[in-house]
């Protein structure tokens, strides 16, 4: 079973809610569209469904599956899924998501219904020997008719850092270093990682100065990068060095500090271990490195009676 990567999901979902306009160039690139940057983007409710899966001990577990990113631009519906690994279930999950979406926008009358299927694509953060180039769902009907519902997948390893910036594919930047996961996690040679992080930092600053990225977008993108770094390093010696490239932690506002203190106080009140509190801090505060989380725990935890 592939390991779950909630940090990747959290970054993707936080980005879509806070900075949906950054996804317009992604939609243009993936689906060969030409929407202007200021086009209206509607985030649609990601209605979930329940599915039964088998756990390691053979028992059954019920999980709710919710699509990553469902948006409407003009009259088109787009479904994007961010995936770190292909676990063999993506095609059927896309089919299930697509039918849920189609039902919301279906039209019908006596004896007839029209069910519009959304355009979809899967964004693979990492490439393995099992990563497919495309996803295809084949519908078969009793009369022998078959219809293929197909889309090319996005594999981030196929993009150069220059292409990401040239096409303004900002949502890809936080996940770009995932291809170096082995080197980063094993404390191997990370010079290539450093070079690419410096490149992205300088380009984001340049585009911010040119007015293409807002203050919040720049700060959050750097924070998202640091979240992925801390996920991969898991506190090893590479963490501080890599996080500092993006300018260290982005937690500077009083509201963020109040939120951090609240998480620590509530965690200690219910008897959570320090490791659990640290995990919650990094889940709730995008871009907070483990070293800073520990410092906040020491600072605010000492004040409790």
Identify the role of each PLM range.
Residues 1-171, 305:
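Accessory alpha/beta interaction modules
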Residues 8-15, 156-161, 178-188, 202-213:
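Charged, low-complexity surface segments at secondary-structure and domain boundaries
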Residues 10, 90, 176, 198, ...:
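Short alpha-helical segments used as structural interaction elements across diverse proteins
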Residues 19-22, 180, 238, 300:
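Residue-level recognition of alpha-helix termini/interfacial anchor residues
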